[in-house]
Swiss-Prot record:
Keywords: Abscisic acid signaling pathway, ATP-binding, Cell membrane, Glycoprotein, Membrane, Nucleotide-binding, Repeat, Transmembrane, Transmembrane helix, Transport. The chain crosses the membrane at residues 510-530, 553-573, 582-602, 628-648, 652-672, 679-699, 738-758, 1144-1164, 1179-1199, 1228-1248, 1263-1283, 1289-1309, 1317-1337, 1372-1392. PANTHER family: ATP-BINDING CASSETTE TRANSPORTER (PTHR19241). SUPFAM superfamilies: P-loop containing nucleoside triphosphate hydrolases (SSF52540). It catalyses: abscisate(out) + ATP + H2O = abscisate(in) + ADP + phosphate + H(+). Together with ABCG40, import into the embryo the abscisic acid (ABA) delivered from the endosperm via ABCG25 and ABCG31-mediated export to suppress radicle extension and subsequent embryonic growth. Involved in root secretion of phytochemicals (phenolics and sugars) which regulate soil microbiota, influencing both fungal and bacterial communities. May be a general defense protein. Glycans are attached at N116, N472, N899, N1040. InterPro entries: AAA+_ATPase, ABC2_TM, ABC_transporter-like_ATP-bd, ABCG_dom, ABCG_PDR_2, P-loop_NTPase, PDR_assoc. Residues 141-414, 808-1053 form the ABC transporter domain. ATP 1 binds at G174, P175, P176, G177, C178, G179, K180, T181. Disruption phenotype: Early seeds germination on imbibition without stratification, and reduced abscisic acid (ABA)-mediated inhibition of stratified seeds germination. Altered root exudation of phytochemicals, with increased phenolics (e.g. benzoic acid, salicylic acid, syringic acid, tartaric acid, lactic acid, alpha-linolenic acid, cyanidin, sinapoyl malate, valine and indole 3-acetic acid) and decreased sugars levels (e.g. This is ABC transporter G family member 30.
Length: 1400
């Protein structure tokens, strides 16, 4: 709580002369003399110069330049100012305010008014279930051309009005879906293009169009979006640098000038702090150190943020980082959305206390929405805005809110948090329990009734009167509002973004090294395949040289693919920071362009250096460098193209298919697959739009106009010119520089497109809401009918399935990890306790105490580190394989398959995890009961969706996570923060359900951060931990928490708990690190010395002994269901995941249609007229195009899909839901019908357009070959995901894989010419078998004579001599083509079962 009065003012003087020793006159004189040296400096120098504490060597205070503070100096200064956050932060702010007031300077303030504010969103009305299936999407696309879609509007905010005042803290409360987030976004000026906004929002009487609201205020989102490679400090430093200092420097100059005039000597430490935080553009800012301290992030300041696949900070720390990222800036108007998610109540209280101090002392304007504020936290607020159904019910002082509802007959119970009461009073199901007039009948009071009553009340009338008066602009400083978009100058913004980009490249250096290593491997293979093919200058070897040049270009084209996924992975953070005006798009784009140039140049140089002389190109050194120049420029254009595609399309699916289409178009029109002279005249323009064409022109001109190709063949035509004529690439000797200029133009064009897309392209929005016609047509009145009392067995837990009660005991558990510096860090220290059947245990502690770590160790989820100690289940050592069968784990982060419904998620869990002898009817009844218990039955048909994009809200996902585990009927349930992200009412519902589960005799343990009094006293036992993973208390809380209160109040010096204080908040507060230091108590050691510890140890030892007649936990099989049932269940889920993922499948269908159509047009009827070898090679090129490019696209699409589902797979595999083989083969089988559809479409389009021979036999061979090819590419993509830790590595591996398949397909260089030491790679390459099947089946039996390199030959003989294809070998080809998918699919299943890249 905030301290006031003289006592605090006396404490406030303790730091004033800390740089001097003693309190005598000499010290005062020394201070004056040292300050005089600062005062003599020019104004600019004076505001960046301060006095720091005396150093130990000279014994004197030091004059320092605050722009050059080292890390140690910054930490020393912050430690001196804010040693204990609870007291020192208030003291610091008061000193700053006192200094400002002393010279008579007024701080800028902002008042935010909103009047009749309305927000509406468009919603699509459909018939049937509102589920986006493949068929629904196709129907929707067709209906757009036939008739308009039926749409309606949903009101999110409905004419709300109010005032958020400076100097006051306002709390925003309301149930989920009431419009809190929308209100916060609207007030901060974040209007989405997809919504319609009415009414007005004003800051200090100015409308949002008159200034820059995004810079004046800060909206802190409930989504934690950060760059995982950066550390916490680096994230805050970058944010502080980009947000600038606002008006701090002007205020500092004014203060300095006035103090000099009035001869005032400020507190040196405060002066140093104010000056250091007023300097713009610093790489490392003192404000960062201050925010790290205030938010408790100093302990993880140098830890990388991390993500789902990379270790990093905890969820609570990420939430605080999101807050700190914006609070570190100069804005004092803060709109904060659910900032306490994942935080313990003590940490939340501390943070909100600091914000309250900022509001009261610095006159900041702060509006915060919280889900479950503890009573102590609730008391910190001055005003409350209570919302319901998109309307404001109450907007007035906090102190009057209980009295307002008492007028309606509703009273908050004595041991009930007011915030919890306010959230539940809106609920039709919970309102009656607060009715206090037992002598009068209760009837449901609607939201509108509350609103009307408030408007008629004195509070409502007062608010209306204030809103009717115009704001007096003359009362505030103009610099309270921001009129500049960007805080930094252009050069400073570019420097900041460049520093960050360079750092990220260093952090991702392994990806770049891996990419270069694969390039070296491809180059080594290529140069040995084409070994000295250029030694002979004839048409045949010239053709091989063309193939080697195409191979180089194709490899460097694919080399740009990883840039696409890397760019997309950063777009989320970029969009957030661009919207906040951290920097313009060009400042972000230029460093990412320029710093990648050396990588492209290096890769191209490596390729040229390794291959040029070994393959046998023209030996002149000049031509070596000219080839390198073209290759590096081409590679740059490709990287730039993929970067631009990512910036334009923004999503991984849309960008991937566009990238694949780009590769297809570039290759088809590039002049190698089909010569320009063979293209239809009306499509010839495509050749000039492809960078690959210019690269081909430049490379071939460089080679075939060289002296060794200058031998005249006939009619003054040289050998080189003849080769170029055959390929349609003869554009003269000077075409090299034309091609080079064109490639430079492409580089500039694509990079300009990238910058423009980042600048003007709208950010990805949440998917449009879909509502069923039935729900839309339902009368509105039905929503306001009071709910009947629920008497179903769902609320009483009547369905009890058989299970074995189990006790988990753990003694002296320790856990160690190795830090990046190679040191060992202990996270758990000698934890002893027991989890008992029928007992609901809470695991509590401040953020970072090790709660989740202990839960992970006990449940067996840790994949790294060293675990010591003894863990037993039922008196026997824990065996993870069997333990996983009887335990459930609710993760902190809600990981679910996005394309199945809520009810299907539960059915899937019950199907695979309940014993096989439980019939389907019972399972379905249990699913229904659990849905009702956690109140998900109303949305059971809703698709889960992707977090932040579509589907369920955060709190609905949390309830789904719990429901999925409850329906599995485990004996032991571990729950990691089951109430995080839920409002007070939803948390109460969930914990009521959990309590019911525990009362059936199951063992349940939950980590919990912000329990209300009701929830805290629901638990039967408490395990309390402190920082360092040490045990502080283990035992029952007692009636009304009496036992835990009695234990801690027995320590002398501890403050007694106040009346109506939440015991959970109190014990977390008194056992914090700062409280221990203040009291001089080590609660961990005190617990070990206590009688309670000895009693607990005896109990644990008794429970650790197996009872007579018992036996260790074992099952007849590893999984609950048979392998066949597992496969069926997984296939059922995969079916819905694919069917309801139209973007995944429509893009693949669209690509095959486009590829087939382009091939049909470019090779129109060419299969009927074969007269020479080039005609046949061109037809072979069409087959190559139909095999390689759709396969590449399918491979890319499946990589995205499998990578997205892998975290779900890890969760389900840990729960022993199924064998990895069952999951893998279900994934394999579901691809079959979709690949068959693609093959049919391709065959139907291509066969008649290209003019292949119309026979059932040959058509079947084409269909069969393409079908097997697609399966091979699909399963290869799955295998790449199984082999790599993240999608970036998988895409990099894909690029190398494509290059190898392209090289050994038999098209670029035929089988007969491949050196014997590489021929095994030809037979290993699936594309070679597919192409052999296609070409041999079509022409292997054709005896027509054609002209081959000047002589006549039968087609079948040419195929055998040139390509090595025999019609008689088709039986072998057929066998290999079906064997390949089976082998690759088996490898995928094997590696999915053996490899895990999840780090815990």
């Amino acid at each position: 709580m905030i301290q006031t009065g003289e006592e605090d003012e006396e404490k406030a003087t303790s730091l004033e002369v800390e740089f001097a020793s003693g309190n005598g006159v000499d010290d005062e004189e020394e201070l004056r003399l040292q300050w005089a040296t600062v005062e003599r400096l020019p104004t600019f120098k004076r505001v960046t110069t301060a006095l720091l504490a005396r150093d130990e060597v000279s014994g004197k205070g030091r004059v320092i330049d605050v722009t050059r503070l080292e890390g140690a100096e910054r930490r020393l200064l912050i430690e001196m100012l804010v040693k204990q956050i609870e007291d020192d932060n208030l003291r610091l702010l008061r000193k700053i305010r006192k200094r400002i007031d002393k010279v008579g300077i007024e701080l800028p303030t902002v008042e935010v008014r909103f009047n009749n504010l309305s927000v509406e969103a468009e919603c699509q009305v459909i018939h049937g279930k509102p589920i986006p299936t493949l068929w629904n999407t196709i129907k929707g696309l067709l209906s757009e051309f036939i008739c308009s879609k039926k749409e309606t509007k949903i009101g999110i905010l409905k004419g709300v009005s109010g005032i958020v005042r400076p100097g006051r803290m306002t709390l925003l409360l309301g149930p989920p879906g009431c419009g809190k987030t929308t209100l916060l976004q609207a007030l901060s000026g974040k209007f989405s293009d997809s919504v319609k906004v009415g009414g007005e929002v004003c800051y200090n009487g100015c409308s949002l169009s008159e200034f820059i609201p995004e810079k004046t205020s800060s909206y802190i989102s409930q989504n934690d979006l950060h760059i995982p490679e950066l550390s916490v400090r680096e994230t805050l430093d970058f944010s502080a640098c980009c947000q600038g200092i606002g008006s701090r420097m002007e205020i500092m100059k004014e203060i300095s000038r006035m103090e000099k005039l009035q001869e005032i000597i400020p507190d040196p430490a405060v002066d140093a702090y104010m000056k250091a935080t007023s300097v713009e553009g610093l790489k490392n800012n003192l404000q960062t150190d201050y925010i790290l301290k205030i938010l408790g992030l100093d302990i993880c300041a140098d830890t990388r943020v991390g993500d789902a696949t990379r270790p990093g900070i905890s969820g609570g720390e990420k939430r605080r980082l999101t807050t700190g990222e914006l609070v570190v800036g100069p804005a004092t108007t803060l709109f904060m959305d659910e900032i306490s998610n994942g935080l313990d109540s003590s940490t939340t209280f501390q943070i909100v206390s600091c914000l309250q101090q900022l509001a009261h002392i610095a006159e900041a304007t702060i509006l915060i929405s919280l889900l479950q504020p503890a009573p102590e936290t609730f008391e910190l607020f001055d005003d409350v805005i209570l919302m319901g159904e998109g309307k404001i019910i109450y907007h007035a002082p906090r102190a009057d809110i209980c009295r307002f509802f008492e007028e309606f007959g509703f009273k908050c119970p004595e041991r009930k948090g007011v915030a919890d009461f306010l959230q539940e009073i809106m609920s039709k199901k919970d309102q009656e329990q607060y009715w206090c007039h037992r002598d009068k009948p209760y009837s449901y009071i609607s939201v509108d009734s509350f609103i009307n009553k408030f408007k008629e009340s004195n509070l409502g009338l007062l608010l209306k009167e204030e809103l009717s008066k115009p704001f007096n602009k003359s009362q505030t400083r103009k610099d309270g509002l921001c009129y500049k978009k960007y805080s930094l100058g252009k050069w400073e913004m570019l420097k900041a973004c460049s520093r960050r980009e360079f750092l990220l490249m260093k952090r991702n250096s392994f990806i770049y090294l891996f990419k270069s290593a694969l390039l070296v491997f491809n180059a080594l293979v290529t140069m040995t395949v084409f070994l000295q093919v250029g030694a002979t200058t004839d048409s045949l070897h010239g053709n091989y040289l063309m193939g080697s040049l195409f191979t180089a270009l194709f490899r460097l084209l694919a080399d740009g693919l990883p840039e696409l996924t890397l760019t997309i992975s950063r777009l989320g953070v970029f969009c957030k920071q661009k919207d906040l005006y951290f920097y313009p798009a060009w400042a972000y784009a230029i460093p990412s362009i320029i710093l990648k140039i050396p990588l492209s140049v290096l890769d191209s140089f490596i390729w040229t250096l390794l291959t040029y002389y070994v393959i046998g190109y023209s030996p002149e050194v000049k031509r070596f460098f000219l080839q390198f120049l073209i290759l590096s420029t081409f590679n740059l254009s490709c990287v730039s193209m993929f970067r631009a595609i990512a910036a334009i399309f923004r999503t991984i699916i849309a960008s991937t298919i566009t990238g694949a289409i780009s590769i297809l178009v570039l290759s088809l029109f590039g002049g190698f697959v089909i010569p320009k002279s063979s293209m239809p005249a009306w499509l010839g323009w495509g050749f000039w739009l492809s960078p690959l064409s210019y690269a081909e022109i430049g490379l071939t001109a460089n080679e075939f106009f060289s002296p060794r190709w200058s031998k005249v063949i006939s009619s003054k035509t040289t050998a080189g010119e003849q080769m170029l004529d055959i390929r349609g690439l003869n554009f003269g000797r000077h075409s090299y520089w034309t091609a080079f200029g064109a490639l430079v133009g492409f580089v500039l064009f694509f990079n300009a497109l990238y910058v423009l897309a980042l600048t003007y392209q709208n950010n990805p929005q949440r998917s449009r809401a879909i509502i069923s016609h039935e729900k839309y047509s339902r009368p509105i009145e039905e929503d306001f009918k009071p709910c009947p009392k629920i008497t179903s067995r769902a609320k009483t837990g009547k369905i009890i399935l058989p299970f074995k009660p189990l006790t988990v005991t753990f003694q002296n558990v320790q856990y160690y990890i190795e830090t990046p510096q190679g040191k060992t860090r202990q996270l758990l220290s000698d934890i002893t306790g027991a989890l008992k059947p029928g007992v609901l245990t809470s695991l509590m502690g401040v953020s970072g105490a090790g709660k989740t770590t202990l839960l992970d160790v006990l449940s067996g989820r840790k994949t790294r580190g060293i675990i010591k100690g003894e863990i037993k289940v039922g008196g026997y050592p824990k065996v993870q394989e069997t333990f996983a069968r009887v335990s459930g784990y609710c993760e902190q982060f809600d990981i679910h398959s996005p394309n199945i419904t809520v009810e299907e998620s539960l059915k899937y869990s019950a199907w695979l995890r309940l014993p096989y002898n439980i019939d389907s009817k019972t399972k379905n009844e249990l699913v229904k009961e659990v849905l009702e218990t956690v109140e998900l039955d109303d949305i059971k048909d809703s698709v889960v969706g992707l977090p932040g994009i579509s589907g369920l809200s955060i709190e609905q996902r949390k309830r789904l996570t719990i429901a999925v585990e409850l329906v599995a009927n485990p004996s032991i349930i571990f729950m990691d923060e089951p109430t995080t992200g839920l409002d007070a009412r939803a948390a109460a519902i969930v914990m009521r359900a959990v309590k019911n589960v525990a009362e059936t005799g199951r063992t349940v343990v939950c980590t919990i951060h912000q329990p209300s009094i009701d929830i805290f006293e629901t638990f039967d036992e408490l395990i309390l931990m402190k920082n360092g993973g040490q045990l502080v208390y283990y035992g029952p809380p007692g009636q009304n928490s009496s036992k835990v209160i009695e234990y801690f109040e027995s320590f002398s010096g501890l403050p007694k708990i106040q009346k109506n204080c939440n015991p959970a908040t109190w014990i977390l507060d008194i056992t914090s690190k700062s409280a221990e230091e203040k009291l001089g108590i080590d609660f961990s050691q005190s617990y070990k010395d206590s009688t309670l510890y000895k009693q607990n140890k005896m109990v644990v030892e008794q429970l650790s002994s197996a009872s007579l007649g018992s036996e260790a936990l074992r099952f007849p099989s590893q999984f609950s269901q048979t392998a066949w049932v597992q496969l069926k269940a997984c296939l059922w889920k995969q079916h819905y995941s694919y069917w309801r993922n139209p973007s995944h499948n429509i893009t693949r269908i669209v690509f095959i249609l486009l590829d087939s159509t382009l091939c049909g047009l470019l090779f129109w009827q060419k299969a009927e007229d074969i007269n020479n070898q080039q005609d046949l090679i061109s037809i072979f090129g069409s087959m190559y195009t139909l095999v390689v490019f759709p396969g590449m696209n399918n491979c890319a699409a499946v990589i995205n899909f499998i990578a997205a589902e892998r975290n779900v797979f890890y969760r389900e595999r840990f729960a022993r839901m199924y064998s990895s083989w069952a999951y893998s083969f279900s994934q394999v089988l579901i691809e079959v019908p979709y690949s068959l559809l693609q093959s049919l479409l391709c065959t139907i389009i291509v066969y008649p357009t290209i003019g292949y021979h119309m026979s059932v036999y040959k058509m079947f061979w084409s269909l069969y070959s393409i079908f097997c090819s697609l399966l091979i590419f699909n399963y290869s993509g799955m295998l790449m995901v199984a082999l790599t830790p993240n999608i970036h590595m998988a895409v990099t591996l894909r690029s190398s894989f494509f290059s190898m398949l392209n090289l050994f397909a038999g098209f670029v260089i035929p089988k007969q010419k491949i050196p014997k030491w590489w021929i095994w790679m030809y037979y290993l390459s699936p594309t070679s078998w597919v192409l052999e099947g296609l070409l041999s089946s079509q022409y292997g039996d054709v005896d027509k004579e054609i002209l081959v390199f000047g002589e006549k030959k039968r087609v079948s003989a040419f195929l055998e001599d040139y390509f090595g294809y025999k019609h008689e070998s088709l039986a072998v080809v057929a066998f290999v083509l079906i064997a390949y998918p089976i082998i690759v699919a088996t490898l995928f299943a094997f590696f999915m079962s053996k490899l895990s890249f999840q780090k815990k």
